Amino acid sequence: MANPFVKAWKYLMALFSSKIDEHADPKVQIQQAIEEAQRTHQALTQQAAQVIGNQRQLEMRLNRQLADIEKLQVNVRQALTLADQATAAGDAAKATEYNNAAEAFAAQLVTAEQSVEDLKTLHDQALSAAAQAKKAVERNAMVLQQKIAERTKLLSQLEQAKMQEQVSASLRSMSELAAPGNTPSLDEVRDKIERRYANAIGSAELAESSVQGRMLEVEQAGIQMAGHSRLEQIRASMRGEALPAGGTTATPRPATETSGGAIAEQPYGQ
């Protein structure tokens, strides 16, 4: 039976991880993914370099071993030649020594040739491993480039998504006519203006229907009548300024006092 504390711990860790992923910045997550891909490529490149280095080292050992084999072959031939010359000269002791030297060189030659065969096998395996490592690095480099290109695309899409979210929020706010915070909405401002306008109209109607309103109307009517009378007087005086038909200038007459006490203007010549 599983430990309940372990299960609870795993559940909390999974929940915590999901919450982090849910609230994490996508831009940061994209950068983390690219950095992880770069670290993987770097590690793969180092491993491939070690494999290729091992193949190069085996190649150098093989070349040295082949050079040693060539030298041993030359030594064996030289020892056999000297042994033949000593035998021809009748020097059996020298011939024996040269033959023994030739046998020793031949034994070394056999050992070197066996070592070369082993090195060739290892070298072939190293060549195959190096080729595979190179291909793996090339493939991973292509994958890394694709991820970098994908990062650029995702960042562009992320910026577009942010702008679209802002536009959508603005449109939603305008459609609901709900201004954020303490700023009044358009409906509230419209209601306030209409309420003030209606109150002003109501006050004007009350003023017109009151006694003071009637008195004000009488005063306004008197002012208008006086203004009309004054206008007619000015017109009459302007008509009197014109010359008579005989060409003589009319003698002006003093203004006479009207019944109301005001002095009325008299046109010239009347």
Swiss-Prot record:
Disulfide bonds: none annotated. This is PspA protein. Induction: Expression is regulated by ClgR. Induced by carbonyl cyanide m-chlorophenyl hydrazone (CCCP). Induced by the cell envelope stressor SDS. Belongs to the PspA/Vipp/IM30 family. It is found in: Cytoplasm. Self-associates and forms homooligomeric complexes of high molecular weight in vitro. Datta et al. show that PspA interacts with ClgR and Rv2743c, but Armstrong et al. fail to observe interaction with either ClgR or Rv2743c in E.coli in vivo when assayed using a bacterial adenylate two-hybrid assay. Also interacts with the serine protease PepD. Disruption phenotype: Loss of the gene does not alter resistance to cell envelope stressors. Involved in resistance to stress. Facilitates intracellular growth of M.tuberculosis. Associates with and regulates lipid droplets (LDs) homeostasis under conditions of stress and may regulate non-replicating persistence (NRP). Could be involved in preservation of envelope integrity and tolerance to surface stress. Has an inhibitory effect on ClgR activity. May block ClgR activity after stress and then, form a multiprotein complex with Rv2743c-Rv2742c, leading to the release of ClgR. Keywords: Cytoplasm, Stress response, Virulence. The gene is pspA.
